[in-house]
């Protein structure tokens, strides 16, 4: 029946460095919602947030989705009569369920979730707390530690520490003693490996800290370990379900931004060629990781696996994983018997 159809607001774009990834993910999700099995379940209203934070209605959002991601949006916007609003497009009043397809700051850090909460309408994914903890690597690691979950050794640094020579010298010595080289330097609140660097000596460490500090005031430095990288997808709120476990192998020195979004630089193995015992442990730890930070609805949990030591460590949790052609989240569910059209429907129904 027509009145049973739900109107879903797909919000994409955003002000973060993962703007283009968000556009690609939104394309995939909207295409899945227009599949024959979903056409009589959902109406879609697409809302585009440009890089300056302005919200644009479906008229323009659809043009963004249809166009080459490299086209000049500023020129395009000048050609249409409708000009961007500082407030919400009027058609958002029709939206019954929000589906934020936003990555990085302001998209999966609790900001947009707080806004959705104020509208009184349900939304796909974690709430404010789960999103905030899942975005900030320092807070996430603290929550994992409190839950007794295995992690690689790390140190936390604040950008203000870099201005105090004595404090910085102490922290460098601490990193060299506790973590050693090589090590990874990560901005605490960015995704898709944006701003991450690998340091093999003190000079590279200092350069990596400077780079991270330009992007975030909170920085994580992690010990480098020789390990395989495993991933597990999660869905559900009251009952959390896990997918099969996948593995990512890459030709570069580490799993950087280019590796994540280039077809030729990575190889995915689904299911991962690992012992069943390890696979079950990954699935179990994935559920515990979600509970530790109050993540729900959708998540992907990443792990390090040292097969020689038969050891697992949680790397991080992503509370709004990508839906691009190279994204593991939909591929893991597809291999688990849930295709993309079924998956997006389940995510909306779990809101």
UniProtKB/Swiss-Prot annotation:
Co-factor requirement: Mg(2+); Mn(2+)
EC number(s) reported in the record: 6.3.2.4
GO cellular component, one term: cytosol
Sites where the protein binds Mg(2+) 1: 302, 316
Amino acids binding Mg(2+) 2: 316, 318
Keyword match Zinc-finger: no
Residues holding ATP: 176-231
Recorded catalytic activity of this chain's protein: 2 D-alanine + ATP = D-alanyl-D-alanine + ADP + phosphate + H(+)
Annotated GO biological process: cell wall organization; peptidoglycan biosynthetic process; regulation of cell shape
Recorded coiled-coil stretches: none
InterPro entries hit by this protein: ATP-grasp, ATP_grasp_subdomain_1, D-Ala_lig_Van_CS, D_ala_D_ala, Dala_Dala_lig_C, Dala_Dala_lig_N, PreATP-grasp_dom_sf
GO molecular function: ATP binding; D-alanine-D-alanine ligase activity; metal ion binding
Note on how the cofactor is bound: Binds 2 magnesium or manganese ions per subunit.
Pathway(s) this gene product operates in, as recorded in its UniProt entry: Cell wall biogenesis; peptidoglycan biosynthesis
A Pfam family it matches: Dala_Dala_lig_N
Described purpose of this protein according to its UniProt entry: Cell wall formation.
NCBIfam families assigned to the protein according to its UniProt record, in alphabetical order: D_ala_D_alaTIGR, PRK01966.1-4
Protein name: D-alanine--D-alanine ligase
Organism: Prochlorococcus marinus (strain SARG / CCMP1375 / SS120)
Lineage, broadest ranks: Bacteria, Bacillati, Cyanobacteriota, Cyanophyceae, Synechococcales
């Amino acid at each position: 029946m027509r009145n049973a159809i739900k109107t879903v607001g797909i919000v994409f774009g955003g002000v973060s460095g993962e703007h283009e990834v968000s556009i690609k993910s939104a394309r995939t999700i909207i295409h899945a919602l227009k599949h024959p099995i979903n056409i009589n379940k959902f109406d879609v209203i697409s809302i585009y947030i440009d890089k300056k934070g302005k919200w644009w209605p479906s008229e323009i959002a659809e043009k963004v989705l249809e166009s080459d991601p490299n086209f000049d949006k500023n020129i395009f916007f000048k050609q249409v009569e409708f000009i961007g609003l500082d407030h919400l497009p009027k058609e958002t009043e029709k939206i019954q369920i929000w589906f934020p397809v936003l990555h990085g700051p302001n998209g999966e850090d609790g900001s947009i979730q707080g806004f959705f909460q104020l509208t009184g309408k349900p939304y796909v994914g974690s709430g404010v707390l789960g999103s905030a903890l899942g975005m900030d690597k320092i807070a996430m690691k603290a929550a994992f530690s409190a839950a007794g979950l295995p992690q690689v050794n790390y140190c936390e640094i604040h950008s203000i520490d870099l201005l105090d020579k004595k404090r910085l010298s102490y922290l460098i010595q601490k990193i060299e003693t506790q973590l050693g080289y090589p090590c990874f330097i990560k901005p605490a609140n960015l995704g898709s490996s944006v701003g991450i660097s690998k340091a093999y000596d003190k000079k590279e460490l200092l350069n990596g800290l400077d780079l991270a500090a330009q992007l975030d005031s909170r920085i994580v430095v992690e010990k480098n370990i020789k390990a395989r990288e495993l991933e597990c997808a999660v869905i559900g709120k009251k009952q959390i379900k896990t997918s099969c476990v996948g593995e990512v192998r890459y030709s570069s020195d580490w799993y950087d931004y280019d590796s994540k979004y280039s077809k030729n630089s990575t190889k995915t193995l689904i299911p991962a060629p690992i012992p069943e015992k390890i696979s079950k442990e990954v699935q179990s730890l994935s559920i515990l990781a979600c509970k530790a930070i109050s993540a729900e609805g959708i998540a992907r949990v990443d792990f390090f696996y040292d097969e020689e030591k038969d050891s697992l460590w949680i790397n991080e949790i992503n509370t709004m994983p990508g839906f691009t052609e190279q994204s593991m989240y939909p591929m893991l569910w597809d291999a688990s018997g849930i295709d993309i059209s079924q998956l997006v429907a389940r995510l909306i129904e779990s809101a």
